[in-house]
């Protein structure tokens, strides 16, 4: 039996399984300005809009060809141009560490230190990161310390016995996924994983790691029936060793690399995920807001008539948004396994679907928290994501899809331009409801504020097809409001923004108000 080198820098192109000797020294990096700026910034107060990408299916040289992959070098140029035009600040890459099975999407890793050879060499991947940095785009990697596959050449039973994994199968095997679980109580295993995290950050200059399946690491009974798991020394279901691992991991990575984001995909209500370890937190920079995602999608899928009975699905997340540093995510997991693409989740036919999605994305942009959108969902990909084929890029040339794409682009550029949309994401001072209770008409209005409290944006979003030609919305002071964007025109040119002046007329508990013609599925963002 031949095993791959756990520390190999490169691997054979699948289905080959051998490790490949690779020299990763000597690459000519020229992203020092980017790294310096990153190290001085507080990421929680920066605009972060993430484009989640699976390189193997983002674009292909032949859409239907099994491989037909762009190389890291080719993808760097294509992807940077697209991301820059759209206004995303970061890309998050799935499946970069070497993995044998395409259908795992890169979440069953056999080569933790090897960029997958599907797209080129280690230095090709360095080129990718360097090129994106030169274009002002950050790079985040999916990282999988939760489990590893049982492939014979991988880490499982590495010396003929459990070595990297827990020996007791009640802790060392994940029944749902058929994979092995790392033994977080072994110093050697913890060092292996932490050195791997540092390797990607320090050797490849990546700007963050999105840690996959955190909940499966935190709970000993995750995915297990009674009798299939072992309680901790206190009789509880918390994996105390994994908790200490996270605290140590985040302290080391962020202590050595200020400005690098550690992001938790944590699907439960585990407390203090993004708090400091000295406060008994796990020490992550951000946490995916899975609760918001679930409530948002359940609401958006409803026929507009029934939305008034589910109004709280859109307001509930605004009761806890300060509890963590959140990222609002519409990820790959939501557009696979018969869940439908984002556009096909929307009710109605034809243009109604596009109008619904524009309204949903506008609400998402205004909601506190950083943003993540999976590839294809910004232009309305009809099909669910399939890792075997390219996105349907021809759709972006069709009018409805192109208008949706341009609308998302306008939203993202507004997001980067106005600090009120990102400076106070987990601070009550950064958000103010104007009307959270207009459930009968399914209209939401709220204000986002910057640190000065003087440069604000007012959002109004209508989630029904009913026109409101004289919709009155409260405003806290006498002022002029400039309409930056609506669902009909997209973003207005600065010199062409329609203006409205608030009048002394109480509305929504505010002393002033404006009247605005709010169309069906209408959206409006005002600056004041």
Model regions and ranges:
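Carbohydrate-interacting/catalytic domains
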Residues: 1-46, 72-87, 351-354, 365-373, ...
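Core domains of carbohydrate- and sulfate-ester-processing enzymes
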Residues: 1-39, 135, 154-167, 302-318
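Substrate-binding/active-site clefts of carbohydrate-active enzymes
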Residues: 5, 37-45, 54-238, 510
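Active-site-proximal helices and loops of the catalytic beta/alpha 8
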Residues: 131-135, 158, 162-167, 173, ...
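Active-site core of glycosidic bond-cleaving carbohydrate-active enzymes
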Residues: 317-342, 359
């Amino acid at each position: 039996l031949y095993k791959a080198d756990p520390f190999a820098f490169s691997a054979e192109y699948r289905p080959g399984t051998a490790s490949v000797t690779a020299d990763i020294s000597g690459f000519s990096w020229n992203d020092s300005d980017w790294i310096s700026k990153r190290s001085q910034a507080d990421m929680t107060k920066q605009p972060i809009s993430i484009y989640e990408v699976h390189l193997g299916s983002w674009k292909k040289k032949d859409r239907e060809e099994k491989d037909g992959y762009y190389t890291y070098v080719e993808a760097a140029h294509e992807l940077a141009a697209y991301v820059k035009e759209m206004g995303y600040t970061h890309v998050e890459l799935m499946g970069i560490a070497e993995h044998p099975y395409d259908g795992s999407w890169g979440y069953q890793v056999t080569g933790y230190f090897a960029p997958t050879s599907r797209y080129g060499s280690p230095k090709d991947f360095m080129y990718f990161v360097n090129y994106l940095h030169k274009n002002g785009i950050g790079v985040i990697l999916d990282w999988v310390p939760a489990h590893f596959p049982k492939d014979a050449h991988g880490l499982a039973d590495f010396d003929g016995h459990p070595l990297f994994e827990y020996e007791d199968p009640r802790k060392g095997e994940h029944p749902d996924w058929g994979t092995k679980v790392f033994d977080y109580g072994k110093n050697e295993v913890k060092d292996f994983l932490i050195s791997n995290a540092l390797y990607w950050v320090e050797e490849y200059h990546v700007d963050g790691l999105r840690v996959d399946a955190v909940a499966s690491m935190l709970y000993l009974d995750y995915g297990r029936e009674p009798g299939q798991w072992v309680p901790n020394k206190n009789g509880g279901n918390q994996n105390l060793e994994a908790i200490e691992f996270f605290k140590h991991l985040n302290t080391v990575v962020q202590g050595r690399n200020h400005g690098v984001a550690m992001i938790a995909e944590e699907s439960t209500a585990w407390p203090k995920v993004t708090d400091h370890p000295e406060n008994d937190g796990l020490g992550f920079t951000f946490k995916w807001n899975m609760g918001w995602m679930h409530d948002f999608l359940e609401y958006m899928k409803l026929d507009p008539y029934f939305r008034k009975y589910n109004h709280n699905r859109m307001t509930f997340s605004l009761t806890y948004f300060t509890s963590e540093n959140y990222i609002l995510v519409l990820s790959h997991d939501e557009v696979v396994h018969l869940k439908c693409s984002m556009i096909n989740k929307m009710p109605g036919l034809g243009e109604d679907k596009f109008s619904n999605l524009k309204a949903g994305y506008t609400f998402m942009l205004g909601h506190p928290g950083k943003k993540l959108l999976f590839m294809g969902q910004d232009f309305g990909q009809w099909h669910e994501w399939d890792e075997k084929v390219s996105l349907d890029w021809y759709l972006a040339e069709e009018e409805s899809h192109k208008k949706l794409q341009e609308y998302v682009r306008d939203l993202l550029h507004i997001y980067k331009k106005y600090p009120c949309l990102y400076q106070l994401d987990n601070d009550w001072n950064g958000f103010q409801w104007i009307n959270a209770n207009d459930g009968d008409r399914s209209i939401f209005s709220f204000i986002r504020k910057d640190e000065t409290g003087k440069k604000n944006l007012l959002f109004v979003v209508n989630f029904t097809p009913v026109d409101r030609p004289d919709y009155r919305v409260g405003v806290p002071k006498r002022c002029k409001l400039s309409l930056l964007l609506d669902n009909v025109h997209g973003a207005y040119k600065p010199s062409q923004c329609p203006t409205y002046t608030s009048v002394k007329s109480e509305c929504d508990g505010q002393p002033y108000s404006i009247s605005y013609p709010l169309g069906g599925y209408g959206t409006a963002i005002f600056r004041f």
